[in-house]
Swiss-Prot record:
GO cellular component assignments: side of membrane
UniProt keyword Membrane, yes or no: yes
Top EC class for this record: hydrolase
Location within or outside the cell: Membrane
Annotated binding of Zn(2+), by residue: D11, H13
UniProt-recorded name of the protein: Snake venom 5'-nucleotidase
Family statement: Belongs to the 5'-nucleotidase family.
Tissue specificity statement from the Swiss-Prot or TrEMBL entry: Expressed by the venom gland.
Protein role: Hydrolyzes nucleotides into nucleosides. Snake venom 5'-nucleotidases are widely distributed among venomous snake taxa, but there is a lack of information about their biological activities. They have been shown to inhibit platelet aggregation. This effect may be due to the liberation of inhibitory AMP or adenosine by its action on ADP released upon initiation of aggregation. Venom 5'-nucleotidases are also known to synergistically act in vivo with other toxins like ADPases, phospholipases, and disintegrins to exert a more pronounced anti-coagulant effect.
Obligatory cofactor(s): Zn(2+)
Length: 54
């Protein structure tokens, strides 16, 4: 996994950890990563193959 910093509209920085939780095949047969985003230990979003790799 790796970390990045995002900037909120109120100028408060939050460290977000992106965790690769595997891969799955997209509609066209490609292997695409499935990742989860966490900030302060709270899951922000679970990205699907429809959002990653296109």
């Amino acid at each position: 996994s790796f970390e990045l910093t995002i900037l909120h509209t109120n100028d408060v920085h939050a460290r977000v950890e992106i965790i690769n939780v595997g891969s799955e095949k997209s509609d066209d047969g490609r292997q695409v990563p499935v990742v989860q985003a966490y900030a302060f230990g709270i899951q922000l979003h679970n990205y699907s193959s429809q959002e990653i790799g296109k």
